[in-house]
Amino acid sequence: MYFGLSEDQLFFQENVSRFLEDHASLDVIKKITEGEGQNLQKEINSGLVNLGINGLLVPEEYGGLGLDLLFAAAVSQSLGENVAPFSFLGPYVMAPIALSHGSSNEQKRKYLSDIAENKIKFAIGFTEFIAARNGSGVTFKNNKVNGRLMFVLDIEGATHLLLADESGCIGIVDLADKNIEIVKLTTVDKTRSYSE
């Protein structure tokens, strides 16, 4: 019995690695982490989206590739090996899985299709459910969210926020709302964005 990646998974992984080797050298990564390579980062993001990464886990019926977590793991390995400054886990793994399993049919049609078409991008704020921090907390009441979240993942370039309260109830917030304040958190990893 064979326990490795399939030919399709290897092919997808190799395409991602090849793209990153060509467009995301360590010199490019260094410029991006020093705040000088905004256009370079946009080119990397655009190129990876053109490879179909945004629709990897979105079901085919909503315009995605309908692949599985093993494909996502293979892509994640390539992104990690190349120190890619690319928001992947939150917007293109966690969000499609949460929306596929926890949203209404109307929400699936709207949000999953928009992810596959690269019209929206989700940041993830699940720390309240996973490991609440002092001074943080969110509540849902009357279709409104109130509170403060720490360590929101992948907020840079995001249009929406997928967040959870301490009980695991998940909500969606449009980041264009004027009542939202985003504070960038400084961490050791300069290739990822975290916020409050």
Q: Where on the chain are the PLM-derived regions?
A:
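Internal helix-loop-helix
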Residues: 49-109, 117, 154-158
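FAD-binding core of flavoproteins
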Residues: 113-196
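Intrinsic disorder at enzyme termini
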Residues: 1-8
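C-terminal helix-coil-helix/basic helical segment that borders enzyme active sites and/or dimer interfaces
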Residues: 28-36
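Conserved "HGTGT" condensation-loop signature of ketosynthase/thiolase-family condensing enzymes
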Residues: 14
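Active-site-flanking structural segment that lines cofactor/substrate pockets
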Residues: 39-53
